Amino acid sequence: MTAESVCLTLVAARRRRDELFDFLSEQRDLVAGFSASDCAGFGPTVRLPSAPEQVKGHADQVLLRIILEKPQADLLLSRIKTAFAGTRLVYWIMPVTEFGILDDRGPEADH
């Protein structure tokens, strides 16, 4: 990537998972792919809306990571802020110093 690469991280209530997946899949002009995993939210600002979450003491959440260039991250974040206003979705953007994909040829392919 020639422009500054960044990682846009999103954290939302797990019940929003499919909605987020659908939304990101529709952003083909900005998002080539993303990674997602389930996570647990802790802290004084985390809401525990369900009885199971209250018993466990943490919120069931989904965490998504998207690697893209900074201008595209800013545009995507603007769209997310509009589409998910009021949902308490948490986000942050961090620089990526290196990004790549290891191919399936293995180290012996270099010889």
Q: What are the functions of these language-model segments?
A:
Residues 1-111:
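Positively charged, small/polar-rich N-terminal and surface patches that mediate targeting and assembly
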